UniProtKB/Swiss-Prot annotation:
GO cellular component annotations of the record: cytoplasm
Record flagged with keyword Cytoplasm: yes
Active site: 82, 353
Official protein name in the record: Probable RNA methyltransferase sce3898
BP terms from Gene Ontology: rRNA base methylation; tRNA methylation
Source organism phylogeny: Bacteria, Pseudomonadati, Myxococcota, Polyangia, Polyangiales
Species per Swiss-Prot/TrEMBL record: Sorangium cellulosum (strain So ce56)
Family label: Belongs to the radical SAM superfamily. RlmN family.
Note accompanying the cofactor annotation: Binds 1 [4Fe-4S] cluster. The cluster is coordinated with 3 cysteines and an exchangeable S-adenosyl-L-methionine.
The protein's required cofactors: [4Fe-4S] cluster
Bias kind Low complexity: ranges: 373-382
Length: 393
């Protein structure tokens, strides 16, 4: 909950509300005795308005290869979500990659979460609490002024399918008396929901936008990302352009490379043409982030074949070799389009891009919604306050 909401709900002074929100985010609870900076009556009013709720840390796995850490948090209903602490280039700064849903309904072929199906949306406080707990662990294990500098909505779930709660979480995360994270350091990554993209532009325009492409060729994209059937790329990019103009930020286009599916010179040429066309139309060039596929599922588990058939042959080995990656980038560069190769660390602990997935309590019960049996199928501190828990959200 924001300080203004707490002040209105509890009838307390805004200054007291800001200090109480700060206490809740810093401590994870409201102290039994009021500190000198907060009036006792205000603290009592906030305490009576609702309980502090939190998540249970059930697993912490630090990569042996790089400074990535994966966390598993149990929710109050028994479901579990995963988050990742990502090191940034500047020493002592980290980004928190957070989940917005338990599972996901979109069934993207290269994403482990999509194989879970969707159980439910996360509440705003559950999203914010992931960041608070990652920050607490960072203080305990790294210290020395290390801090969470940014937040990446690219964990489990499609953030814009839960836009109400994600936007509320963003407001709390950026509140100076809460997590105090600059909105410009918050990125929301989407598979392509135009209405949600437009909401970001209208309600939290300072937030950055990431778009997962999969492929820019309609037939291939629809195979890898079934959402393309409901929202074709042309429709999505129109909304992305509106966001770019409203925010002034270049959109990040994430392109997961899969051997023999979307990594040919022709694929690169199509991507370059689309990027150049977007820049010409909207006056802002997208930032291309190439992501070599990270293993999901059981070893040898195949992905959809390039022609969409059930005999998937070559797709059983979807890992792009370095020579092919270099050739792909060379085609982009020759067309005047720059790109970076994203380093997805934490693969040894299942923390790399596309690997987050946990069995949920709902999905394990009869009636729980599961993903289609194969990719490519059609897919359609807590808070302080009376109606929500007292910590972020």
């Amino acid at each position: 909950m924001l300080p203004e909401e707490l002040a209105g709900a509890c009838g307390i002074d805004l200054t007291d509300a800001r200090r109480i929100v700060s206490l809740a985010h810093r401590l994870g609870e409201l102290p039994a005795r009021a500190p000198a900076t907060v009036r006792r009556a205000a603290l009592d009013a906030a305490r009576s308005a609702g309980e502090i709720r939190t998540l249970a840390l059930v697993e912490r796995r630090a990569s042996a290869e790089d400074p990535f850490v994966k966390y598993a948090f149990r929710l109050e209903d028994g479901a579990t979500v995963e988050s990742v602490r990502i090191p940034l280039e500047r020493p002592g700064r980290y980004s928190a990659c957070v989940s917005s849903q338990v599972g996901c309904a979109l069934a993207c072929a290269f994403c482990a979460t999509g194989r879970m199906g969707l159980t439910r949306n996360l509440e705003a406080w559950e999203i914010v609490e992931q960041v608070r707990l990652i920050r607490r662990d960072l203080d305990a294990t790294v210290g020395g002024g290390a801090r969470v500098h940014g937040v990446l909505f690219q964990g489990m779930g499609e953030p814009l399918a839960n836009a109400d709660r994600v936007i509320q979480a963003i407001r709390v995360l950026s509140e100076p008396s809460a997590q105090a994270i600059d909105m410009r350091n918050i990125t929301v990554c989407t598979a392509g929901l135009p209405s949600g993209i437009r909401r970001l532009a209208a309600e939290v325009p300072a937030v950055r936008l990431g778009l997962s492409l999969g492929s820019v060729r309609p037939g291939k994209r629809r195979l890898l990302m079934p959402i393309d059937g409901a929202h074709p790329l042309e429709e999505v990019l129109a909304a992305v352009g509106e966001h770019a103009r409203a925010s002034g930020h270049a959109p990040m286009w994430a392109y997961t490379l899969l051997a023999d599916q979307n990594d040919t010179d022709e694929d690169a040429a199509c991507l370059a043409a689309l990027a150049r066309g977007f820049a010409a139309q909207h006056g802002i060039s997208p930032r291309l982030s190439l992501i070599p596929y990270n293993a999901i599922g059981a070893p040898g588990d195949p992905l959809p074949s390039p022609d969409g058939g059930d005999e998937r042959g070559a797709s059983a080995d979807p890992f792009v070799r370095s020579a092919r990656l270099d050739a792909f980038r060379a085609v982009l560069s020759a067309a005047g389009v720059g790109s970076i190769v994203r380093y997805s660390g934490g693969g040894d602990v299942g923390a790399a891009c596309g690997q987050l997935a946990r069995p949920s309590a709902e999905a394990q019960r009869p009636g729980g919604r599961r993903a289609p049996p194969r990719p490519g199928a059609t897919a359609g501190a807590a808070d302080v306050g009376p109606s929500a828990p007292p910590r972020p959200a």
